[in-house]
């Protein structure tokens, strides 16, 4: 969408105080669209806003952005918050080193660079030499690096970029001996990396869209093989399955180029797995699994032994061992059985395995032998989030550790002594010891025990009037663990409390916890979030006049649903890039892929009724006094299309019966969030904090 100043919208403001304004909201384009679901008619008056290319929609977007900017830019705390956000983000950030073809690589950000830069080292800890700087690919940081893949001979680097936050990807190839890019260029790739094999690589893509590239439904995912030195139009179609147009396909190849895996996903919460013996050029794929409701991931191949991470027969995950000779699941052997804690991932290093578990939403890691023997727990600094990096043939093993107030610190782990030492530690731009984090457990509506983290200043008086930023997600088997973001620090310094609730729908306690927040149990997620808010009020951390709820994507749905169900409970609501139209979400881009978690309005009358019962867009009521609401979206969000936020904003503005503002912030040259330039992140967070605090009377 081209968001330009198509006309100047006259703003009428009643007073100079930003929170005491009379809002004359822009008139949104409407029509008389009515859809019929199982005999029930549902009006969709703002359907024209689904066309983000129309002149009417662009005019409305421009007018809404003018109104929003006029409000936000006048908030007295914004300059101070913006300045502090830049200060706390301005520190050197170094990732975990990794080795490819006997060369060490690392990502580094000098401080306020929009994107981190890939470097190589002459030796571990040695001089850094620039390999790839995404900041040089655009003037404003809106080209992001989405993935890299080294050829098995070490000469080439295929790198994947995305422009303006879109899910659409392009692939380029760099010759590491000369440092120059080849002429090879792949467009319209999506959801996959380059898988090297022979003199080229495999990649996943869709046909080039004829129009509406950022909203039209993506169908028939294909795998191509690209031979270096040729044009994309000459690429060989390697695999497609038109019988199942709503599935994703991707291949990976082991480093010896003896085994290829094909992953098929998209119609269930898991995937199918296929394997092919590349030693025999006439070999075909052999199906290893046939259950799209379970997850199967080949995490390592040693010879013809295949180590597979799965939740099949193990809701909290386990590690299985297969062999190319008999690869079917019935011949697999259990290597590490399911534990009482959730297994998150497995890293191979120096002839060992590191198994990373989650216990009450924090990392607990253990060293294992290759035959599945537990050799002891790896001591971590505190409650937090650890991420390991290593190679089965390398002595060196690293992990990054962070918590809510601990910036990512890289440790080198010795598998022989089972000890860690700091490899790199950032210099904090704030006083870390002034904050405290505690974990509490509260009871949800149906009696379920739910964990929650709270972070705040040690000297904070819990007087029941502290500003609270309550964050949640609750979906798609994704766990929220403690992790560091400098963006939180200014809010905490202002006396705010950051709260992260571990709702059902995530993976905090395995597949059962996930399923308890899906389809016709989705209300559990909203009940968990509402119960978290009520617990915070009952325990004198805050009151309803100082409580903000925030969530993005599926978390935006969470905020939208809670806003409509309990408008009396919250002072401020921030639904970010949210799924807000639950009756039509599956009609756009890859929305169909979310059906295993949500169900669709076409599944059955019962499913339609359930979705209609909580869909944020369809549960707004005229004349209700809704909380102050700042809706955020972006023009290039082709994951959750901006139409969700557009229609929700227009409807909420028309329904608002109170005096609290209802604004929408529509970013340009941005997408769903991944790869967003640091400068844009800082500007957005300054807007959010200033909006929250202003509407709490701060």
Regions found by a protein language model. Give the residues of each.
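Non-catalytic accessory segments flanking enzyme active sites
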Residues: 55-149, 160, 247-277, 283-301, ...
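Hydrophobic beta-strand positions that form the internal "hydrophobic ladder"
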Residues: 104, 154-158, 201-202, 260, ...
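Beta-propeller blade signature
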Residues: 120-121, 172-176, 219-229, 274-278, ...
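A conserved hydrophobic secondary-structure block that centers on an alpha-helix together
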Residues: 130-193
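Active-site-proximal cap/loop segments of hydrolase catalytic domains
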Residues: 500-698
